[in-house]
C-alpha cells in the first residue's frame, strides 16, 4: 500500500531490505559516503507511480519457473547471501530450474552492485 500511495516509506523499507548489515552501517569504500543513503536518494528520484508499477510488475510475474526451465544457454546466477528482496532460497530455486546453471554467492544484500561491485564483476567474468 505504501508504494501504491507513493508513500516514500515504501522506498525506505525496500532500501533497508536491499542492503546487508555492513551496507546499512556505511559500507562504502570512500570515507564519508554511505551506500544506504545513496540508494535511498536514487529511489527518491523515481517519478510518481513508477516505483509502484515496478513492484506490481514483479509481484504479478508468474511465468518465472516456466521461463527458467526453457533457458538453454550457459547461465550464472549471482546472489547475495543477505538479500531480503529476492532471498538466496528463491535465487537458488531459479538456478535449480535451469539445466547446468552455476551459482555464485556473494557477501551482500540485493544491492550487490553497490556493495560488492568488484565481486560481481569477477563473477560475470567467469561466464563471458
Predicted feature locations:
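Short alpha-helix in the alpha/beta-hydrolase fold that links the catalytic acid
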Residues: 73, 87-96
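Residue-level signal for the nucleotide or nucleotide-sugar donor/cofactor binding architecture
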Residues: 46, 86-89, 115
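Short beta-strand/loop motif that positions the catalytic acidic residue
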Residues: 71, 77-79, 83
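Conserved alpha/beta-hydrolase catalytic His-Asp/Glu region
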Residues: 2-69
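Catalytic active-site module of serine/aspartate enzymes centered on a nucleophile-bearing elbow/loop
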Residues: 99-128
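Hydrophobic alpha-helical packing elements
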Residues: 10, 51-54, 94, 113, ...
Amino acid at each position: 500500500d505504501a508504494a501504491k500511495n507513493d508513500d516514500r516509506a515504501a522506498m525506505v523499507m525496500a532500501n533497508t531490505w536491499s542492503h546487508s548489515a555492513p551496507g546499512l552501517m556505511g559500507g562504502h569504500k570512500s570515507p564519508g559516503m554511505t551506500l544506504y543513503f545513496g540508494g535511498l536518494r536514487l529511489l527518491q528520484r523515481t517519478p510518481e507511480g513508477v516505483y509502484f508499477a515496478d513492484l506490481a510488475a514483479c509481484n504479478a510475474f508468474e511465468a518465472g519457473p516456466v521461463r527458467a526451465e526453457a533457458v538453454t544457454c550457459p547461465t550464472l546466477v549471482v546472489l547475495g547471501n543477505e538479500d531480503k528482496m529476492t532471498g538466496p532460497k528463491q535465487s537458488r530455486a531459479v538456478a535449480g530450474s535451469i539445466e547446468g546453471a552455476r551459482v555464485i554467492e556473494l557477501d551482500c544484500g540485493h544491492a550487490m552492485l553497490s556493495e560488492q561491485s568488484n565481486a560481481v564483476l569477477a563473477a560475470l567474468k567467469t561466464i563471458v
